[in-house]
Amino acid sequence: DECVEATYRLMQSDFMGPVNIGSEEMIAINDFAQMAIDISGKDLSIYNIDGQDFLDKYGHKCPIGVNGRNSDNKLYQEKIGWSVSQPLLEGMKKTYEWILEQVEKENK
């Protein structure tokens, strides 16, 4: 719901440039995936491949990336005057519940 509010506020503003909207909490992709698994209550495992296995599967070396991702919302805060207030985990839980509701409606 905060993403919707942020988008609505942006649309109501006079600002015309690109902005980031998201959690400012730094999180690794594996941790984000594990968070989604934990919220869902499903019995899933994360499997990463690297080294020779990655090379064999994709034909090039495994890319080296950053340790985590987060959103820098400073420009949004400056131009729109609003910022995210709920933790990433809470937003993910609400999103998962909303998705479940949509799936249940579709399956009726």
Show which residues each predicted segment covers:
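C-terminal substrate-binding subdomain of Rossmann-fold SDR/epimerase-dehydratase oxidoreductases
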Residues: D1-K108
